């Protein structure tokens, strides 16, 4: 690894440990040329994931957009930020498990709704009202009936 101080390619690892909840490895290095110590991180490089929007355009997957959407739906609900982070992790992991390079925004929305339905009914309905773009009360009532039918099965 190149030393950021003297730019020579001679360094050795003097310490290595897990970081970022085991998603990275933190390595402490020392340059064998000048003795400068520096830190590097090693992470798994995931293949880029593209989202196919409703208009057919493509954009890079952005977990922060999903997190923002579920945070808006969960406003003033007894849901912690950790629960929302976990929800978004589940959605992203489910997408990556499918092994696809592209996924439609509709499929992402369905995954989010599935996760929200298991977390909080009100947040689910709020998210569904925006995601499904209800045109009238009947669409909203249909989502409510779906939620109530789910509870009847439990």
UniProtKB/Swiss-Prot annotation:
Keyword Lipid metabolism in the entry? The reply is no
Example of a GO MF term: ATP binding
Q: Name the domain of life.
A: Bacteria
What is the gene called?
A: nrdR
Q: How is the cofactor bound?
A: Binds 1 zinc ion.
What is the required cofactor set for this protein?
Zn(2+)
Q: Record's Pfam families?
A: ATP-cone, Zn_ribbon_NrdR
List each coiled-coil range.
Answer: none
Matches recorded under NCBIfam families = transcriptional regulator NrdR (TIGR00244)
Family statement = Belongs to the NrdR family.
Annotated ATP-cone domain residues: 49-139
Supply one GO BP term. negative regulation of DNA-templated transcription
Its protein name is Transcriptional repressor NrdR
Q: Where is this region: Disordered?
A: 1-22
Summarizing the function annotation, the protein's role is: Negatively regulates transcription of bacterial ribonucleotide reductase nrd genes and operons by binding to NrdR-boxes.
Keywords of the record, alphabetical order, are: ATP-binding, DNA-binding, Metal-binding, Nucleotide-binding, Repressor, Transcription, Transcription regulation, Zinc, Zinc-finger
């Amino acid at each position: 690894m190149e030393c950021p101080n003297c730019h020579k390619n001679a360094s050795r690892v003097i310490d290595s440990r897990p970081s970022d909840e085991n998603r990275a490895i933190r390595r402490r290095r020392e340059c064998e040329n000048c003795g400068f110590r520096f830190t590097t991180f090693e992470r798994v490089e995931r293949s880029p994931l593209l989202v196919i929007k409703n208009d057919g355009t493509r954009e890079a997957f952005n977990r922060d957009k999903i997190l923002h959407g579920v945070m808006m739906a969960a406003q003033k609900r007894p849901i912690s930020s950790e629960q929302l982070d976990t929800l978004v992790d589940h959605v992203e992991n489910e997408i990556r498990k499918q092994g696809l390079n592209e996924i439609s925004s509709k499929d992402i929305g369905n995954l989010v709704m599935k996760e929200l339905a298991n977390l909080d009914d009100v947040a689910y309905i709020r998210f569904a009202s925006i995601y499904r773009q209800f045109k009238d009360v009947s669409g909203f009532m249909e989502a409510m009936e779906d939620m109530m039918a789910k509870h009847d099965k439990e």
